[in-house]
């Protein structure tokens, strides 16, 4: 029997032999894979169910079990009729009697071309074997039969065979067009077309214009690449070699909506004609006859088309697509042998060198005054060193091709505000302040003097809250906002809250304080007319006698289930369940409940946690604020039962969420009501009330908040015109987040203290306060509103350890914290002594335990990007991995069968991060449980969401925060207004000496859970504080100190002096800028795009990145020491170049990214592709998910299936897109599910095609130069306009490309020689201007491989052409080519991504053809299979078009398909 054995000659070697054959005179070769037969048959009985078998061997498929008389028939298409030679890739272990015969079916009869003996070799060692005879084939499809024709029972195994044209039927009349690169535009007598974007030069005769650029116009289904940004007098030139002399008609395909616009035609600087150009719509294209006839001689000529105006008005004009030249007569046969544009009959210098300028006699004109060969004389050339091949304007300066209709500096495809007023400065999305209203108060940002007005506020014309002077309606000396008793009678003495004794009842016994003789009547006891109860007059109640109501008290802890009820007081109505719960507090209700029939059920919907016990049995438990919970009918024994209810809150919001917080149905059903509404109380309890310890005690220290010695702010609330606290007669108001007051307070004795603050706040919100003593936080708390400015409440500041070790005067700071911008009006702070001095826990961070490395100097030498470290195959991120966004997503209904392999964002606990019990609970319950189900767990280290961890790590994080030029904290408002342990979510500075130890501490805690992979959300490291207009730089003391070191290593003393720095040891960059009048605002605006001439600003940007790279490298090295083989990811992207991490220990990229849904959902935008290309350039897989607003836009437009395109595009370009389960969209909606059924098939398709994804890499013949400095100036993290424009142009032309990355002056990386060698062509665009001189010289060494992107149309064989129903449709379907990284024999792959959407759904396409140039891949494509997400795989019939391209027919293409290509 035939068995497989190791192949000796590789398939790649065999194919290289075919290429040699294909380079013969006619070079038409058709390759046929043996397994691609149409039918098989045979006669020999070998026991095999089929006459012939298909098998796999050494990475290829072939046929075996071929016996004498067995045959396979093939349908083979050729474009030219004629004689073809035959070559087989064939092998046999039969010494003699093995032969192969080839026949062709002609008019129903088989005509044999003879047989060829197969020499002895090995079954699976396929060797090239030339047939003895040729075969005659007709143009089109031929039926060919290959037969086992020898005498032996066993014949041969066959891999493939090829047919090469030897003699065409009519070799004297070849129908192939001229090579488009040979200087001829077409054949004599035939029309030819020039694409107008392939201009040779452009410029303008008006100084207000700069010539035309390349852009796009048209409807989504009919896009045209055009010359764009065309203003009056702009022109484009084309150097054209006309094939014949004669009269030509010249037409222009164009659109335009300017009624007075014209197009002027010039031939060799002579005006021929002027015609009107107006189609009424930029998207409607028509042909305009520029001339019906003009004589042009054979040879080279310059054709110019210039825009004009019938009324001489300067304005936007037309958009030109193509020029068509039609010869009107047979043309002269007079030739032009030297191609100098002068016919041979009059050429007196017949051998002119190629490219030379000549006079009318054909003789060379010597020009020596154009040094850079850009066509502009040196005397007027303002840019004398223009790079070779660049397009230039009339001044000799390179043209940057960016489509920007409103001229605001933001390319149209990224412009969220397309009609910006002329000259207005804009942000990264193209919006001027006059087009924005950030706080939605109805006043545009350009005139809004209070840009952060709270929602719903009434504002004036400047956008600031309308404030009326404080009122005092009852004239008692206490303003209404603080007056707790607003109708005090005239003349009465009042307290600080505006209440007279006659208006107060402090013990709630029904007798006012002015006549109450027993001031502290116990709660629940009845008082007489003088305010005294029987127990106060000598009587009492038996504590063992059941009393109405439940005993109520409060305990420390988010859910304290171990400590007993402190029994502060009795509550009969349980209304406390409907109030807010203090932070880090558990409310406890204990006693008895009576139920007559035993049928009873309970309900809760409380933020955060609830536990309900009946007779000691837990019957209700819930830790979710989002979802309510309830019991069924408990079917108790009729009578009295013990009850215990515990309600806990960790932090932030609390209390009833929606409707009632705690409910009961005494009939055991679902008609729940609050207990306070029951006609009879069913609760009793036994025991004495201990009293509320939070009540004021004798000897307490009272701090009146209006008595501060200093006030200021750490925050930034734009609508607050008061810096710090605003004092009133009895308190403070105008308090916003970060405002603080300092007080001198004397503590008479040491001890442990508690702290309370009395505030009022009319609205619901997130309010809080922190108390510092001598610069150290001792107490903090969070609380809700009081419902009115007239109602105040005292709140316990429950957090911290408040210990005074020595008596005496202390500096006490009271600071407003919490989530809301506008905070509270404050009355006082009260300190009560609780006991003796207790031990103070030491902070986790001790600076003495850590070495801080000296800051390194700048990187100045040209260097290479570091390749990521090798990760073992079993631990790598795979291109076919399918990850949940969060591990818990797998538990959602419908999402358990997506073929998932792991999870993206495995969040460690948000609080108590350094409590090993909490960490190990996370390890067991989250990490190990997930891994036990066969998934990989990626644990996430944090920056922004780690703000709470950092507070726990340092206890006092304030010295380590980023500080702006005006000395404010930078709050990370993009993640929400959050606060933890007394500190808001402020930005941690990378410059802090605590930064590296903190990050290492994260690593230590996370690795205790043994996750499979690590990912750090590094995009919010503090380099971003220098990256966006909203934040404004890091001028913290630690940053200033590090900048001094960095500058001293970059500059000499003399150079520093020239910069205005005379003493580097005392230099403070913040003081330096402030002394020159630079403000926070001017710095921020300039820093956003590196404009505005701020001294040392670029140095400062580079310095921040250098320090960030140095410090994070320490962390990455620390990880590698502990886990050498672990994958480490980070949300660092090449196009956020200010914070990019140049480190080999990072092995994949991750994060949230912008996908452009708000721009359009009619087609897949290309802006994300720069990130995928960037990841490819640094050899790291990109794993990502969109920003919340992207899916929210799909929700608003009811287009959940649009995201399928995002997923398909990610995997097609080598990335991973995590499963969109319940996605966070923010706002009042919180989360939204786009539907499991809309995405399941896409992800199962990924897993099914793992062999075509894993270990595959991008394949292209074009490299695109990318200068990282362009991203520095972009103002957003998606790169600059030019790279976005170039990416769009190449993608929608189906020109696959990869990036050649050039760094900036701060980190001047360059491509390696092997990076350049990968590409046949290198394109550059306007961003070339950002290369350093050294980088430009390196690029220039690549010679004529380098050309401007505008010349892409002159290069053949670089694109895969997609057509639909015969119409080229590259902008509709992207054809993304990829090859295996290491296995040259593996199939090639082309991903087909269908880009348009209609109503959020991808239209299914039929009659699609994909044309792949024969020379595109390293080897010729010989077979194809189409794989679709519906589970089908279809073998495709290959054909060849007139250009020799392999053409593949594709049908039923929805959003994505994969072409598997044999070769």
From Swiss-Prot:
Can you give the residue ranges of the PA14 domain? 534-677
Domain CBM6 per the UniProt entry, residue ranges: 701-832
Biased composition range(s): Polar residues: 518-536
Q: How does activity depend on temperature?
A: Optimum temperature is 45 degrees Celsius. Stable up to 40 degrees Celsius.
Please give the residue ranges the record annotates as the region Disordered: 166-191, 512-549
**Which reactions are catalysed by this chain?**
Endohydrolysis of 1,3-alpha-L-galactosidic linkages in agarose, yielding agarotetraose as the major product
Annotated GO biological processes are: cell adhesion; polysaccharide catabolic process
User: Propeptide residues, per UniProt?
Assistant: 28-684
Q: Which GO molecular function annotations are given, in alphabetical order?
A: alpha-agarase activity; calcium ion binding; carbohydrate binding
| Free-text function comment from the UniProt entry | Alpha-agarase. Hydrolyzes agarose, agarohexaose, neoagarohexaose and porphyran. Hydrolysis of porphyran by this enzyme improves its antioxidant activity. Does not hydrolyze kappa-carrageenan, iota-carrageenen or lambda-carrageenan.
Q: How does it assemble?
A: Monomer.
Return the similarity comment.
Answer: Belongs to the glycosyl hydrolase 96 family.
Q: What is this protein called?
A: Alpha-agarase
Source gene? Answer: agaA33
């Amino acid at each position: 029997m035939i068995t497989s054995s190791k192949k000796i000659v590789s398939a790649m070697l065999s194919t290289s032999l075919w290429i040699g054959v294909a380079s013969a005179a006619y070079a038409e070769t058709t390759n046929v894979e043996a397994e691609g037969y149409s039918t098989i048959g045979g006669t020999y009985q070998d026991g095999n169910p089929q006459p012939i078998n298909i098998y796999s061997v050494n990475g290829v498929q072939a046929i075996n079990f071929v016996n004498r008389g067995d045959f396979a028939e093939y349908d083979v298409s050729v474009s030219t009729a004629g004689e073809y030679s035959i070559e087989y890739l064939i092998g046999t272990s039969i010494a003699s009697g093995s032969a192969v015969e080839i026949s062709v079916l002609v008019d129903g009869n088989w005509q044999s071309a003879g047989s060829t003996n197969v020499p002895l070799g090995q079954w699976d060692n396929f060797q090239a074997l030339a047939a003895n005879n040729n075969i005659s084939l007709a143009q089109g499809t031929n039926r060919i039969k290959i037969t086992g024709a020898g005498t032996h029972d066993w014949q041969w195994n066959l891999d493939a065979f090829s047919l090469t044209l030897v003699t065409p039927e009519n070799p004297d009349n070849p129908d192939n067009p001229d090579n488009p690169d040979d200087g001829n535009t077409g054949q004599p007598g035939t029309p030819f077309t020039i694409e107008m974007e392939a201009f040779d030069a452009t410029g303008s005769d008006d100084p207000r214009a700069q010539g035309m650029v390349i852009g796009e116009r048209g409807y989504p289904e009919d896009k045209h690449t055009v010359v764009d940004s065309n203003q009056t007098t702009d022109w484009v030139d084309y150097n054209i070699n006309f094939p014949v002399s004669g009269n030509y008609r010249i037409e222009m395909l164009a659109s335009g909506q300017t009624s007075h616009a014209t197009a002027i035609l010039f031939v060799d600087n002579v005006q021929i004609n002027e015609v009107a150009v107006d189609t009424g719509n930029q998207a409607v294209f028509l042909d305009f006859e520029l001339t019906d006839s003009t004589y042009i001689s054979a040879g080279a000529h310059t054709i110019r088309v210039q825009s004009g105006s019938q009324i001489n008005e300067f304005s936007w004009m037309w958009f030109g697509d193509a020029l068509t030249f039609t010869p009107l007569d047979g043309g002269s046969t007079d030739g032009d042998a030297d191609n100098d544009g002068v016919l041979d009959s009059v050429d007196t210098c017949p051998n002119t060198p190629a490219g030379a300028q000549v006079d009318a006699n054909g003789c060379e004109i010597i020009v020596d005054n154009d040094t850079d060969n850009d066509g502009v004389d040196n005397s007027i050339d303002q840019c004398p060193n223009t790079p070779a091949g660049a397009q230039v304007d009339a001044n000799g300066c390179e043209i940057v091709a960016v489509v920007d209709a409103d001229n605001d500096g933001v390319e149209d495809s990224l412009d969220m505000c397309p009609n910006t007023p002329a000259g207005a400065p804009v942000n990264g999305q193209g919006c001027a302040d006059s087009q924005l209203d950030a706080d939605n108060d109805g006043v545009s940002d350009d005139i809004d003097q209070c840009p952060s007005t709270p929602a719903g506020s009434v504002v004036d014309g400047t956008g600031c809250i309308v404030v009326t002077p404080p009122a005092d309606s009852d004239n008692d000396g206490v303003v209404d906002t603080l007056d707790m008793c607003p109708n005090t009678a005239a003349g009465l003495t009042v307290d600080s809250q505006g209440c007279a004794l006659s208006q107060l009842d402090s013990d709630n016994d029904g007798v006012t304080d002015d006549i109450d003789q027993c001031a502290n009547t116990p709660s629940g006891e009845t008082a007489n007319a003088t305010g005294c109860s029987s127990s106060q007059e000598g009587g009492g109640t038996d504590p063992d006698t059941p009393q109405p109501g439940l005993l109520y008290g409060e305990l420390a802890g988010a859910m304290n289930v171990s400590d007993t009820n402190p029994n502060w007081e009795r509550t009969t109505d349980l209304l406390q369940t409907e109030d807010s719960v203090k932070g880090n507090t558990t409310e406890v209700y204990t006693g008895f409940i009576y139920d007559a029939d035993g049928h009873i059920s309970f309900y809760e919907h409380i933020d955060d946690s609830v536990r309900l016990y009946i007779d000691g049995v837990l019957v209700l438990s819930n830790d979710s604020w989002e979802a309510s919970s309830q019991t069924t009918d408990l079917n108790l024994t009729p009578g009295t039962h013990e009850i215990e209810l515990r309600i806990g809150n960790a932090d932030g919001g609390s209390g009833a969420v929606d409707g009632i917080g705690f409910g009961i149905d005494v009939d055991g059903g679902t008609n729940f009501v609050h207990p306070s509404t029951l006609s009879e109380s069913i609760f009793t309890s036994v025991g004495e009330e201990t009293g509320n310890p939070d009540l004021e005690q004798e000897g307490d220290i009272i701090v009146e908040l209006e008595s501060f010695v200093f006030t200021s702010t750490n925050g930034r609330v734009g609508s607050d015109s008061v810096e710090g606290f605003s004092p009133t007669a009895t308190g403070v108001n105008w308090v916003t987040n970060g405002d603080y007051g300092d007080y001198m307070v004397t503590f008479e004795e040491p001890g442990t203290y508690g702290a309370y603050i009395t505030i009022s706040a009319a609205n619901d919100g997130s309010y809080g306060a922190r108390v510092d003593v001598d610069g150290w936080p001792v107490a903090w708390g969070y609380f809700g509103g009081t419902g009115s400015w007239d109602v105040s409440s005292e709140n316990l500041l429950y957090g911290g350890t408040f210990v005074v070790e020595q008596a005496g005067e202390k500096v006490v700071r009271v600071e407003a914290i919490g989530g809301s911008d506008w905070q509270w009006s404050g009355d006082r702070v009260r300190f009560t002594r609780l006991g003796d001095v207790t031990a103070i826990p030491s902070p986790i961070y001790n600076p003495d335990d850590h070495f801080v490395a000296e800051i390194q100097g700048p990187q100045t030498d040209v260097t290479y990007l570091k390749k990521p470290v090798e990760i073992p195959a079993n631990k790598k991120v795979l291109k076919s991995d399918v990850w949940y966004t969060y591990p818990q997503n797998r538990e959602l209904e419908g999402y358990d069968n997506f073929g998932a392999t792991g999870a993206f964002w495995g969040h460690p606990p948000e609080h108590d991060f350094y409590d090993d019990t909490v960490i190990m609970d996370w390890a067991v319950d989250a990490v190990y449980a997930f891994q036990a189900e066969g998934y990989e767990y990626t644990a996430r280290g944090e920056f922004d969401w780690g703000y709470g961890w950092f507070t726990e790590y340092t206890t006092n994080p304030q010295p380590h925060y980023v500080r702006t030029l005006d000395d404010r904290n930078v709050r990370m408002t993009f993640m929400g207004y959050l606060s933890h342990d007394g500190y808001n979510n402020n930005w941690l500075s990378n410059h802090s000496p605590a930064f590296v130890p903190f990050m290492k501490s994260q690593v230590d805690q996370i690795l205790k859970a043994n996750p499979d992979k690590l990912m750090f959300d590094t995009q919010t490291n503090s380099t971003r504080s220098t990256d966006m207009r909203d934040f404004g730089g890091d001028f913290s003391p630690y940053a200033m100190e590090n900048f001094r070191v960095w500058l001293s290593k970059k500059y000499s003393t003399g150079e520093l002096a020239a910069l205005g720095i005379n003493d580097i040891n005392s230099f403070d960059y913040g003081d330096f800028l402030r002394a020159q009048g630079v403000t926070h605002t001017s710095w921020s605006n300039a820093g956003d795009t590196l404009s505005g001439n701020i001294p040392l600003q670029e140095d400062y940007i580079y310095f921040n990145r250098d320090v960030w790279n140095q410090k994070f490298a320490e962390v990455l090295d620390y990880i590698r020491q502990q886990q050498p083989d672990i994958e480490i990811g980070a949300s660092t992207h090449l196009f956020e170049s200010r914070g990019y991490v140049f480190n080999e220990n990072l092995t994949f990229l991750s994060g949230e990214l912008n996908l452009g849904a708000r721009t359009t959902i009619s087609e897949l935008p290309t802006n994300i592709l720069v990130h995928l290309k960037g990841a490819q350039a640094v050899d790291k897989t990109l794993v990502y998910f969109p920003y919340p607003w992207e899916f929210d836009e799909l929700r608003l437009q009811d287009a959940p299936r649009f995201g399928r395109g995002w997923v398909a595009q990610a995997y097609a370009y080598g990335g991973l897109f995590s499963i969109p389960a319940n996605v966070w969209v923010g706002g009042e909606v919180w989360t939204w599910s786009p539907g499991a059924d809309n995405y399941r098939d896409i992800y199962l398709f990924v897993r099914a095609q793992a062999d075509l994804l894993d270990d595959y890499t991008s394949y292209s013949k074009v490299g695109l130069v990318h200068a990282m400095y362009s991203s520095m100036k972009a103002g957003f993290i998606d790169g600059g306009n030019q790279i976005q424009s170039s990416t769009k142009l190449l993608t929608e032309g189906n020109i696959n490309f990869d990036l050649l990355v050039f760094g900036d002056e701060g980190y001047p990386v360059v491509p390696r020689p092997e990076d350049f060698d990968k590409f046949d062509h290198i394109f550059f665009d306007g961003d070339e201007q950002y290369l350093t001189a050294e980088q430009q010289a390196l690029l220039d060494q690549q010679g004529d491989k380098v050309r401007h992107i505008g010349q892409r149309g002159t290069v053949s064989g670089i694109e895969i052409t997609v057509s639909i129903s015969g119409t080229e449709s590259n902008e509709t379907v992207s054809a993304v080519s990829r090859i295996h990284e290491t296995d040259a024999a593996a199939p090639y792959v082309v991903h087909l991504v269908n880009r348009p959407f209609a109503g959020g759904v991808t239209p299914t396409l039929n009659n699609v053809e994909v044309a792949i140039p024969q020379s595109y891949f390293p080897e010729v494509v010989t077979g194809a299979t189409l794989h679709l997400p519906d589970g089908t795989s279809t073998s495709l019939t290959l054909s060849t078009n007139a250009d020799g391209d392999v053409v593949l027919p594709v049908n039923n293409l929805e959003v994505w398909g994969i072409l598997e290509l044999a070769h």
